[in-house]
């Protein structure tokens, strides 16, 4: 027995099991769950683009960024946002799935809201409507503000207000200089919010907005969130909304996990029954596969959906299939009279191309599903499948192979029967170097 090789093998086992047990649960909790596993709201919007100008890649990217900022203000993250073709009116459609949101109506109002803030130097009363309307171009708009608006209480008046800061402090300085001891008019979504008199020149670019309906902290917080999110590049019209309760999502997750655990336990048992010690090594490699897959999901911020979880479990079968191909090649070499170590080396080498070819075809199928799948569930399944294939190649082809070669080199177990060979094919003898 070669103790150095045996200790190296045991070190591999300890590292895999240690990392999985100590950090695996934390990694699992860090992976964002999709709508079908956590509950939430599914919203379908029609995008009001100018006539003759359909939504292009630049417009889509700007719209996605604006929606993401609004979703983040709800206290949740990782929304699934994707184009859904066009409706009967020829309008582009965009679907927004927000998992974990507690207040569905709040999500609808926040995502579709557009806070159009504008500051004018003059205003008048419209004789037809009797409302105060702005005159001339705006002195500044919400686009001139930093994304750090927040609720404050005015220290002098005690009123609720929204603190704002200009990106270019000199702009606010020039406005306050120009309108010193004169009123300015702050409009929100076309309605006059307040018309304070400028009492001093502001040099810091900071100011406060109060008045109108900004009488409560929540109203100020809502306006601050809308200002921070910025204006939507295109108006959105809500066409449909579907909610998934958190209980239903939790039930789906629980049942899928139970099915996955049963499948993994049966696979582990089969590998040990069929390949004995080699099967146990394959099981340890499968643990490494699961750990690395979850780590990849967390690192890439992949939203785990029910279909993605199914693909993750399917990936276990793909990973173990690579081990089975390798072990059957090793058994063939043992039947041909090769020594155990020689059979392991040659068997791994002969199985490599078969494993790569089979995984490549599955990966191509997953890639096609991702490109042409369209629906979020199909794309989620495809992403999880492709990640699983890549990780399985690393664990089954490289890691499991390294473990098996190290263990056979240790000569702790020399009988080929412990590596899946039928009893009596080769008599127990010392492995040749």
UniProtKB/Swiss-Prot annotation:
Principal location class: membrane
Keyword Membrane: yes
InterPro entries, per database record: Acrflvin-R (IPR001036), SecD (IPR005791), SecD/SecF_arch_bac (IPR022813), SecD_1st (IPR048631), SecD_SecF_C (IPR048634), SecD_SecF_C_bact (IPR055344), SecDF_P1_head (IPR054384)
PANTHER family: PROTEIN TRANSLOCASE SUBUNIT SECD, PROTEIN-EXPORT MEMBRANE PROTEIN SEC
Sorted UniProt keywords: Cell membrane, Membrane, Protein transport, Translocation, Transmembrane, Transmembrane helix, Transport
Protein name: Protein translocase subunit SecD
Stretches that traverse the bilayer: 7-27, 257-277, 278-298, 300-320, 354-374, 380-400
UniProt keyword Lipid biosynthesis present: no
Membrane protein topology class: Multi-pass membrane protein
Example GO BP: protein targeting
Role this protein plays: Part of the Sec protein translocase complex. Interacts with the SecYEG preprotein conducting channel. SecDF uses the proton motive force (PMF) to complete protein translocation after the ATP-dependent function of SecA.
GO molecular function list: protein-transporting ATPase activity
Subcellular location: Cell membrane
Protein origin, superkingdom: Bacteria
Assembly notes: Forms a complex with SecF. Part of the essential Sec protein translocation apparatus which comprises SecA, SecYEG and auxiliary proteins SecDF. Other proteins may also be involved.
Family from the record: Belongs to the SecD/SecF family. SecD subfamily.
Any one cellular-component term (Gene Ontology): plasma membrane
């Amino acid at each position: 027995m070669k103790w150095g090789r045996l200790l190296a093998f045991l070190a591999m086992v300890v590292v895999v099991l240690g990392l999985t047990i100590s950090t695996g649960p934390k990694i699992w909790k860090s992976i964002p769950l999709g709508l079908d596993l956590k509950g939430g709201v599914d919203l379908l919007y029609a995008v009001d683009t100018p006539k003759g100008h359909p939504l292009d890649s630049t417009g889509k990217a700007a719209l996605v960024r604006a929606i993401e900022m609004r979703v983040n203000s709800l206290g949740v993250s990782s929304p699934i946002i994707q184009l859904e073709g066009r409706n009967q009116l020829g309008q582009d459609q965009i679907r927004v799935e927000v998992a974990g949101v507690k207040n569905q109506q709040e999500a609808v109002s926040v995502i579709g809201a557009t806070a159009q803030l504008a500051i004018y130097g003059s205003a008048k009363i419209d004789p037809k409507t009797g409302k105060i309307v702005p005159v001339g171009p705006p002195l500044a708009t919400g686009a001139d503000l930093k994304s750090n608006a927040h609720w404050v209480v005015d220290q002098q008046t005690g009123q609720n207000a929204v603190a704002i800061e200009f990106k270019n402090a000199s702009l606010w300085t020039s406005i306050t200089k120009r309108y010193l001891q004169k009123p300015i008019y702050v409009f929100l979504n076309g309605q006059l919010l307040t018309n304070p008199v400028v009492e001093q020149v502001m040099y810091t670019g900071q100011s406060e907005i109060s008045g109108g309906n900004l009488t409560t902290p929540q109203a100020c917080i809502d306006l601050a969130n809308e200002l921070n999110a910025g204006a939507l590049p295109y108006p959105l019209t809500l066409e449909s909304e579907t909610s998934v309760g958190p209980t239903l999502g939790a039930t789906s997750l629980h049942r899928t996990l139970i099915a996955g655990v049963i499948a993994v336990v049966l696979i582990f048992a089969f590998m040990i029954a069929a390949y004995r010690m080699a099967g146990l090594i394959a099981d340890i490699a499968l643990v490494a596969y699961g750990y690395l897959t979850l780590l990849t999901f967390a690192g890439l911020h992949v939203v785990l959906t029910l279909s993605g979880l199914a693909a993750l479990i399917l990936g276990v079968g793909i990973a173990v299939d690579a081990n089975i191909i390798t072990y059957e090649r090793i058994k063939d070499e043992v039947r041909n009279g090769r020594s155990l170590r020689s059979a392991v080396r040659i068997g791994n080498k002969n199985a490599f191309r078969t494993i790569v070819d089979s995984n490549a075809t599955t990966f191509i199928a997953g890639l096609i599903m991702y490109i042409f799948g369209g629906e979020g569930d199909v794309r989620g399944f495809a992403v999880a499948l492709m990640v699983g294939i890549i990780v399985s190649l690393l664990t089954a082809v490289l890691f499991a192979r390294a473990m098996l070669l190290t263990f056979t080199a240790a000569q702790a177990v020399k009988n080929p029967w412990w590596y899946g060979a039928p009893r009596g094919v080769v008599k127990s003898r010392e492995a040749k170097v």
